[in-house]
Regions:
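A domain-start/cap signature at the N-terminus of enzymes
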Residues: 41-101, 215-221, 317
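Alpha/beta-hydrolase fold nucleophile elbow
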Residues: 160-171
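Short amphipathic alpha-helix adjacent to the substrate-entry channel of hydrolases
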Residues: 115-132
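C-terminal catalytic histidine-bearing segment of alpha/beta-hydrolase fold enzymes
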Residues: 263, 267-318
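Hydrolase active-site cap/lid region
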Residues: 179-230
Length: 318
């Protein structure tokens, strides 16, 4: 009897059957099938279905679950907050439990953690608004800050938020909100100014009846690149000077002010905005708080502000 040679050695215990034509064909067929199964280039599988991450997954910090770059996740007043970097600044986006149709959003440009129970931002989140902020610091709506805001807006658009924002300008945040809005009126549904600075000659300049702030005035001139104080005083890009683009775009305005505010006097800021905007045909509502100064910001019941902002996104509006 013939013996089978395995790996060059003769196995005297294993019989070797003579190779008939039909047996050779069967062997080759089996070998070919085995090779194909072992070759990944020859295997096919159904295309995978992309998984859409849930909010719960995002809350665990899964970076694949978020549209935001370099996302870090935490909580903000019981809502999921995404933190990431944009143009050298820390940005964050708070998402509602259930986004409203069109993904409307509010943007607090400065002091985003101040008086949140009085400014309506938490109620807007409950109504399905996203809420965002970019930390540019005490830069007074300077040209560099506006560049960073532009980069942030582009990220928000790539992330799927609606095309227009409800801007929230608290105190000096009024400079940030109005100056960005004047450059981008088509991206703004409304502005909520709360004791807002609308002319930096008033604050921090202190050139009117208000207290002013010498240190902030010096810092503002540096951020804006003014060579002299006279150049700052001649500047024509304050919110009170740049209302025409907003009126043309029909941006709605609402202000909340304390009538005894001696830091950001109403007569030098909100009253100028009100009279000039109305003269341009714009819509503005001012809520006065008799006997109240610069603080506290907001309202005991912010429902009027919440209603105003929500109405700005209804009836074919953004």
């Amino acid at each position: 009897m013939d013996r089978l040679r395995i790996h060059g050695k003769t196995d005297w215990n294993m019989p070797f059957l003579p190779c008939t034509p039909w047996l050779c064909c069967a062997f080759l067929l089996i070998a070919s099938t085995a090779l194909k199964a072992a070759d990944p280039k020859e295997t096919t599988s159904p295309p995978s279905t992309p998984t859409i991450p849930s909010a719960a997954t995002a809350a665990k910090g899964d970076p694949a679950a978020s549209p935001w770059p370099g996302d870090r996740v935490d909580q903000w007043h019981g809502f999921v907050r995404h933190r990431f970097a944009v143009d050298g600044a820390t940005a964050w986006v708070v998402e509602p439990h259930q986004a409203a149709p069109g993904k409307p959003w509010s943007w607090c440009l400065e002091f985003p953690d101040a008086f949140t129970d009085r400014t309506g931002v938490l109620q807007l989140l409950e109504h399905g608004f996203h809420h965002v902020h970019l930390e540019v610091g005490n830069t007074f709506g300077s040209p560099r800050a506006l560049e960073q805001f532009e980069a942030f807006y582009q990220v928000l658009q790539r992330g799927g938020l609606g095309p227009k924002a409800a801007l929230v300008g608290i105190s000096r945040g009024g400079l940030y909100a109005y100056r960005w809005a004047a450059k981008n009126p088509e991206r703004v549904a409304c502005i909520y100014g709360d004791a807002p600075v609308c002319d930096f000659k008033s604050w921090p300049g202190g050139k009117g009846t208000g207290k002013g702030s010498a240190g902030d005035w010096t810092q503002l001139q540096r951020y804006y690149g003014f060579a002299t104080e006279a150049e700052a005083l001649a500047f024509s890009g304050n919110p009170v000077d740049r209302l025409a683009p907003l009126a043309k775009a029909k941006v709605r305005l609402i202000h909340v002010v304390g009538d005894t505010d001696d830091v950001v006097p109403v007569t030098e800021n909100t009253r100028l905005i009100e009279s000039r905007y109305q003269a341009l045909g714009g819509q503005i509502q001012v809520i006065h708080k008799p006997g109240v100064g610069h603080h506290p910001h907001g309202l005991d019941d912010p429902a009027p502000v919440v209603t105003f902002i929500r109405e700005s996104f209804r009836d074919g509006k953004p």
